[in-house]
């Protein structure tokens, strides 16, 4: 999620840009002309649907739509979506590339593609390795805050641009959940082969957290533990009924329609300087096509379902009390679905936002991540695990 999500989304097309945000206004019905003759009996309204329920349904649906817009959810009908321009460095923002992951280019496994990455490495042999997956519309630079901290404690961090984002192939086109999951597994295998005796952690934020959950549910012999930071687990099963129709129709009826940020009052982080830097980053993907909505929703639904299948060696699931993107009931549903006996650590941070690694209060979640990576059996140093029980009791 990027900095321009601080503003309101309006719907614009490539050929007909809108100057004002779309708004929902009640339809005015023309006055009826009274008929002559006997009046027909008027059927009473069903008692099971009081009229006050209708405005409540509209408010809930509108709230869901605003959260969807904040995510700028993206998938489906990639062939119909226009390609995003290739990112280029600017005077204020340079593009740092430390290497490339060479992976199979599905569906043509004999061909390979390169996913550029940044790395933050300790001076000597690392005690642990982290493969860090960014969120939607973000890039490898999402980890520029956490990466140096982990490297200073002997942990190597590799942060790639995932396919469809940053400077990776297919920028601006949704590659599909299966492709993103396959890419993550291939990159993990590459890092594991470099040194099989160093524990490898798959870490993801938002969309990247959803991928981490999906991989963890199926298991991967190369990966020792998982960290999901504000994972996108808002599955369609938790949407109100009208939103099902929106999701189903968006990719078919308006695949080229784009979402641009204007005046959406959602706080992604309390660190405005960091949000502005993300918005100015040339690797950030802006105005994703609305046709990509359906696929990302499917990914979130898959991650939500896979919460019930988590059987990984160790998993840390983190969520902020001021997360305006993933609703609390979706996170609570995921946490409650985790099987008993699973080695999952739940952590709730009442003071943090969706992009908690950028927050002014980021020291607490970063300290918990560091402890989780360094100490297998030690509890988190903060009160986040206790606060998680309070969160579940309230939701």
Question: Which residues does each PLM region occupy?
Answer:
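Short beta-strand/loop motif that positions the catalytic acidic residue
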Residues: 317-319, 323
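Conserved alpha/beta-hydrolase
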Residues: 147-169
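Short beta-strand element of the alpha/beta-hydrolase
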Residues: 127-135
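Catalytic active-site module of serine/aspartate enzymes centered on a nucleophile-bearing elbow/loop
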Residues: 351-395
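Short alpha-helix in the alpha/beta-hydrolase fold that links the catalytic acid
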Residues: 327-337
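Alpha/beta-hydrolase-fold enzymes
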Residues: 205-289
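Catalytic nucleophile-loop/oxyanion-hole region of alpha/beta-hydrolase
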Residues: 136-140, 165-195
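An N-terminal hydrophobic leader/cap segment in hydrolases
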Residues: 58, 72-109, 115-122, 393-395
């Amino acid at each position: 999620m990027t900095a321009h999500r601080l503003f309101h989304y309006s719907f614009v097309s490539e050929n007909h840009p809108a100057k004002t945000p779309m708004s929902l206004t009640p339809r005015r019905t023309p006055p009826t002309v009274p008929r002559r003759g006997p009046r027909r009996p008027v059927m009473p309204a069903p008692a099971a649907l009081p009229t006050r329920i209708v405005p409540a349904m509209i408010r809930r649906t509108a709230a869901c739509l605003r959260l969807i817009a904040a995510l700028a959810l993206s998938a489906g009908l990639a062939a119909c979506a226009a390609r995003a321009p290739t990112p280029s460095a600017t005077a204020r923002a340079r593009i740092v590339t430390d290497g490339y992951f060479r992976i199979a280019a599905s569906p043509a496994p004999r061909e390979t593609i390169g996913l550029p990455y940044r790395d933050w490495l300790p001076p000597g042999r690392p005690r642990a390795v982290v493969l860090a997956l960014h969120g939607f519309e973000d890039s490898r630079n999402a980890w520029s805050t956490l990466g140096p901290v982990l490297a200073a404690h002997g942990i190597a961090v590799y942060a790639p641009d995932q396919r469809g984002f940053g400077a990776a192939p297919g920028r601006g086109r949704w590659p599909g959940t299966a492709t993103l999951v396959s890419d993550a597994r291939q990159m993990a295998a590459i890092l594991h082969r470099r040194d099989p005796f160093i524990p490898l952690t798959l870490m993801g934020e938002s969309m990247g957290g959803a991928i981490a959950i999906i991989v963890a549910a199926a298991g991967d012999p190369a990966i020792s533990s998982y960290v999901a930071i504000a994972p996108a687990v808002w599955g369609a099963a938790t949407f109100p009924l009208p939103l099902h129709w929106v999701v189903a129709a968006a990719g078919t009826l308006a695949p080229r329609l784009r979402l641009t940020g204007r005046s959406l009052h959602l706080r992604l982080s309390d660190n405005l300087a960091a949000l502005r830097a993300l918005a100015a980053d040339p690797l950030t993907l802006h105005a994703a096509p609305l046709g990509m909505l359906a696929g990302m929703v499917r990914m979130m639904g898959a991650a939500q379902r896979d919460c019930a299948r988590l059987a990984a060696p160790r998993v840390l699931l983190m969520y902020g009390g001021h997360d305006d993107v993933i609703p609390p009931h979706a996170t609570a549903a995921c946490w409650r679905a985790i099987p008993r006996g699973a080695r999952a650590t739940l952590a709730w941070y009442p003071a943090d936002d969706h992009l908690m690694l950028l927050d002014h209060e980021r020291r607490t979640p970063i300290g918990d991540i560091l402890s989780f990576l360094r100490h297998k059996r030690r509890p988190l140093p903060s009160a986040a695990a206790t606060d998680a029980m309070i969160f579940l009791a309230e939701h």
